[in-house]
Structure formats: structure tokens, C-alpha cells
Amino acid sequence: QLGRHSVPAVACGINYAPEDIAQAVDTWHVDSVAFDMVMMISDPAVIKGGEFQVFQGTKQEGQSLLGIRGEEGRDSELPAERVTTVAFPGAGYGFLQQGNMIFHRACRLLEKVERVTLIPSFEVLPASSRDATNSINMLEWTDPGLEAELARREIWRAAARLNALLDSISIADDRGTLHRLIGDALEPLNSLRASLKEPRS
């Protein structure tokens, strides 16, 4: 089950083409959220360039070909036979993608024109479920209040996992099992807490 993302900075974003059309609209990258939608707001019939493309392979393979890692982007070319262009039939059309797994980009514009996309993001529910949002990566963003919102999110989801653990823990569980279960419930929150000690790079 998916629901609106609990972090306001990513719950719904708007992407604009850069003023300098020599720059890519968005370089090859993966997203910090597990699921998002890409919806074209502008009329694609009047846009030259700016194509949305996906790499036909794993994100690790695409990153290796470009010499990058993590979620950083790079404005380079991948083998054309490994790249698919996703067409938008008109304004208002879009698609849902597993953004943290699909290596994708939006190409440079060939002519200066408005190109606007709406990007709603989602997370897996209930809150006790596994969700691949990369809160650690998002700590590097500069949105006002984002660090507190990420902390709230991880506290909320950790509390949900602990509540689920209350119902599932067994009197037969040994020390090792209990240690693992508690650690699993707290790991994302503890990772964020540790990252908050480090200055933004």
C-alpha cells in the first residue's frame, strides 16, 4: 500500500527546465524515494528535446558505466541501445516509477521553452513496513526545516515498528532474536541520528 510521502519537501515537487538550455533538465540519477510519479504539466507537442529517458539495466550497471555511485547525477551519455525514451502523449499524462531503482534522466532542451513536471512522491504503508526512502541522502538537501521533518518521519516509523514488535514478540524468543528484532526496528532511526552528528558536506 502506498500513501502520500510524510516529508513535505518531497510529498509533491515541481521541476522546471534550467534557464541555460546547455544544461540537462535532470542528469542521470536515482531518486531518494522509493516511489514517485512524473506528470508532464506543459504541452509536450511544443517541446523540442527534454525527453525523459530510462536506462535498460540495473541502477548499479548504469552508475558503473558513468563512474558514479549513490544518488549523485552525471550529465553524460549512456549507450543509445540501452536507453528508452518515455513519451508523454499530452499535458496531464504521467507514470508511476520505482524511483530509487530506475536510473533515469531528463535531456537538455533544444530550444528554450517552458517544461514543467509535477513529481508527487509516496511511501510504503503501514508505517511499520519497509520503505526505501533515503533519509540520509536527503539530509544533504538545503530545504528549510527538512532535517526536523526527516527526524519526525523516522521517529514515526520507528514507533510503528516498535508497536508492531510489541504484538509479535514471543516468550520463546531468545536473547539473540530479541537483540536482532529490536535492532531492526531502530536501525533507520539510529542511522539518521548518527548522520545528524556530521556536518553537511
Predicted regions and their residues:
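Short, Lys/Arg-enriched charge-dense amphipathic segments
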Residues: A24-V38, A127-N134, K197-R200
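Catalytic core of Fe(II)/2-oxoglutarate
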Residues: G50-A160
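Intrinsically disordered terminal extensions flanking catalytic oxygenase cores
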Residues: D131-S201
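Conserved double-stranded beta-helix
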Residues: Q1-G50
